[in-house]
Amino acid sequence: MTNLLSIITFLPIVAAIIMALFLRGQDEAAARNAKWLALLTTTATFVISLFVLFRFDPANTGFQFVEDHAWIMGVCYKMGVDGISVLFVLLTTFMMPLTILSTWQVQDKVKEYMIAFLVLEGLMIGVFTALDLVLFYLFFEAGLIPMFLIIGIWGGKDRIYASFKFFLYTFLGSVLMLVAMIAMYRMAGTTDIPTLLTFDFPSENFRLLGMTVVGGMQMLLFLAFFASFAVKMPMWPVHTWLPDAHVQAPTAGSVLLAAVLLKMGGYGFLRFSLPMFPVASGVAQPYVFWLSAIAIVYTSLVALAQSDMKKVIAYSSVAHMGYVTMGVFAANQIGVDGAIFQMLSHGFISGALFLCVGVIYDRMHTREIDAYGGLVNRMPAYAAVFMFFTMANVGLPGTSGFVGEFLTLMGVFRVDTWVALVATSGVILSAAYALWLYRRVTLGQLIKESLKSITDMTPRERWVFIPLIAMTLILGVYPRLVTDVTGPAVAALVQDYNQSQPAAPVATAQASH
């Protein structure tokens, strides 16, 4: 079958349309049917995506499962995956059934809630499979709408503020990208991504407003794309929308925001910035390194000062994404492999940590750290799961969190030792805020009266965590499951990047060894 990617992209959207048209009423039966249809659809999508993985040939560095149909005005409906994107599709389809299962307690507008998540899944898969600039942009921007609604309708008391802040930040970042895409079409005469990857965008310096633009037109295009992807990651200092969005979003919204939506920024750097604008990427490398290093240290320190559990994990996400941008712009095999691995690992671990917060929020309806303490006495299973993912977040050897951080730091050490040393301090800081959070919430005596009747995790909640624990351990023990898939495509990307660098600057020469 050559249309597998279209099936997994549009199956959730078709299910959402069926749900909207044929599921009537707001009674308990309608809510139950909506949940089961969403769960069955997302599970089927995951199973079909496994066929893509099993039939994928990592040795082929080109795009596979390509679908190409003429659409409108020279724009094509073109889909495909390579070693860089295929695992992000799997991450999305893997997380969705678990997310739906975690929302089983939702009572308010259940049908609409499930529709929003199904549409969001289809749009997220579309981002990772689109091979046309216009198609990519449509998926990339449309994904804002269901998440905006999820936060704005089912979020906390400040949900309207948080949803608009999320929408405006990410949308404004993407306006520049749209302008850059139009410029690229005028230069290259096509919106086909595989063709654009081979197009040599001009990189000769020129004067603009009395200043020399180093990297020429490539730099202007790079900055436009960078604005969009940096907000999406998010990078410091354009990260301030994320803590608000996480705090106000319902648990399932936070899980998908952390596990998948943030990865669109990192994927964008790998798909567009490095291969299409290699000269500009080389010029920007030291600046991106230091922005990432500041993000790791600064947001880790900010995490230590939070009183809300979700805010601690949100700032932790910004710090961990700092390792990703470092690994990507190290532009060597080990760094880029590490960045992809870190994104996948962070998807499992951060998603699980938000689920951990959700478990006790469902019982106590507060995320304030001071409201808890001594939970291990009443919730031993929960305490064990929370401890496991806390350690994985810190980067304990044997978990996927260790592999991602280790590979990215190794890649950065080969390019800039000082930046790598600063980033390494983030490992110590992450242990500080993660263990501090765990100790305050679960350890000690159970003193508060309100906690003395709290119950441990239900079987449904345990089943949600089991696949996440399994993936975190499996990838931690055998990381080649990821690197064997990504390796050849990353090697080709790095080789093209190095060949495009003018007169091989020192950093690039070191990175190629």
From Swiss-Prot:
Catalytic activity, as annotated: a quinone + NADH + 5 H(+)(in) = a quinol + NAD(+) + 4 H(+)(out)
GO molecular function: NADH dehydrogenase (ubiquinone) activity; ubiquinone binding
Purpose of the protein: NDH-1 shuttles electrons from NADH, via FMN and iron-sulfur (Fe-S) centers, to quinones in the respiratory chain. The immediate electron acceptor for the enzyme in this species is believed to be ubiquinone. Couples the redox reaction to proton translocation (for every two electrons transferred, four hydrogen ions are translocated across the cytoplasmic membrane), and thus conserves the redox energy in a proton gradient.
Transmembrane spans: 3-23, 34-54, 81-101, 112-132, 133-153, 164-184, 211-231, 250-270, 277-297, 312-332, 340-360, 383-403, 418-438, 463-483
Subunit structure: NDH-1 is composed of at least 14 different subunits, Nqo1 to Nqo14. The complex has a L-shaped structure, with the hydrophobic arm (subunits Nqo7, Nqo8, Nqo10 to Nqo14) embedded in the inner membrane and the hydrophilic peripheral arm (subunits Nqo1 to Nqo6, Nqo9) protruding into the bacterial cytoplasm. The hydrophilic domain contains all the redox centers.
Keyword Disulfide bond: no
One Pfam family per UniProt: Proton_antipo_M
GO cellular component, one term: plasma membrane
E.C. no: 7.1.1.-
Cell inner membrane found in the keyword field: yes
Lineage: Bacteria, Pseudomonadati, Pseudomonadota, Alphaproteobacteria, Rhodobacterales
Protein's cellular compartments: Cell inner membrane
Native species: Paracoccus denitrificans
Membrane topology value: Multi-pass membrane protein
Name recorded for this polypeptide: NADH-quinone oxidoreductase chain 13
Family the entry assigns: Belongs to the complex I subunit 4 family.
Enzyme class: translocase
Keywords recorded for this protein, A-Z: Cell inner membrane, Cell membrane, Membrane, NAD, Quinone, Translocase, Transmembrane, Transmembrane helix, Ubiquinone
GO biological process, one term: ATP synthesis coupled electron transport
